[in-house]
């Protein structure tokens, strides 16, 4: 079994991105599955170009995308990705799309194919705050999730995929009153998510 797990580069003035910091601290194998770890650019263009190529090249059984959602207090497992790019905050190339489709003529939305409720249950049993989220937004995280699910659907693959949002880690919240989580907890959460998804 192969698991493609990704995190993002820093964005929005942050010096680190907890999603990638946690990914790179994971072992190379979990529950007998090989982990393929990749950092993604925080650009609408970049994720649409890179992710389909990654999926074709690595042929993973499972894709777990992760990203930072500063302000959220817990690990959130995304239910759905929508075919929209819309943001007043520029991506890392300075691009601010307005009501643009990710892919012309593609479906309006895709649901995650990860066991989202089982993941939340397993995280809570591990004493990690978690919830299902019904919106991944319309920024690059949603674009990444939609791109992966669309790529898998078009190719007729049986790969399971979804997106996990994580809070700021403590060092990011030193100068701003935002919820935060220990990086070690985020790493543990990723391990729980991978194991739960592999069992589904």
Curated annotation (Swiss-Prot):
GO molecular function, a single term: pyroglutamyl-peptidase activity
Localization per record: Cytoplasm
InterPro entries, per the entry: Peptidase_C15, Peptidase_C15-like, Peptidase_C15-like_sf, PGP-I_bact-type, PGPEP1_Cys_AS, PGPEP1_Glu_AS
EC code: 3.4.19.3
GO annotation (BP), single: proteolysis
Family as reported in the entry's similarity comment: Belongs to the peptidase C15 family.
PANTHER family documented for this protein: PROTEASE FAMILY C15 PYROGLUTAMYL-PEPTIDASE I-RELATED, PYROGLUTAMYL-PEPTIDASE I
Name of protein: Pyrrolidone-carboxylate peptidase
Species assigned in the record: Thermococcus onnurineus (strain NA1)
């Amino acid at each position: 079994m192969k698991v493609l797990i990704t995190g993002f580069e820093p964005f929005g003035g942050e010096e680190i991105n907890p999603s990638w910091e946690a990914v790179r601290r994971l072992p190379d194998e979990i529950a007998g599955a090989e982990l393929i770890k990749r950092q993604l650019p925080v650009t609408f263009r970049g994720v649409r170009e890179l992710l389909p190529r990654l999926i074709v090249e690595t042929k993973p059984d499972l894709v777990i995308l992760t990203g930072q959602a500063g302000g959220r207090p817990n690990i959130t497992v995304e239910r759905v990705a929508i075919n929209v790019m819309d943001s007043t905050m520029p991506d890392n190339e300075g691009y601010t799309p307005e009501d643009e489709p990710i892919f012309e003529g593609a479906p309006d939305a895709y649901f995650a194919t990860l066991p989202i409720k089982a993941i939340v249950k397993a995280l809570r049993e591990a004493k990690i705050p978690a919830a299902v989220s019904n919106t991944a937004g319309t920024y690059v995280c949603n674009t990444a999730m939609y791109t992966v699910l669309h790529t898998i659907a078009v190719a007729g693959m049986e790969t399971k995929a979804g997106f996990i949002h994580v809070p700021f880690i403590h060092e990011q919240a030193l100068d701003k009153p935002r919820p935060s989580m220990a990086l070690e907890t985020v790493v543990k959460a990723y391990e729980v998510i991978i194991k739960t998804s592999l069992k589904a």
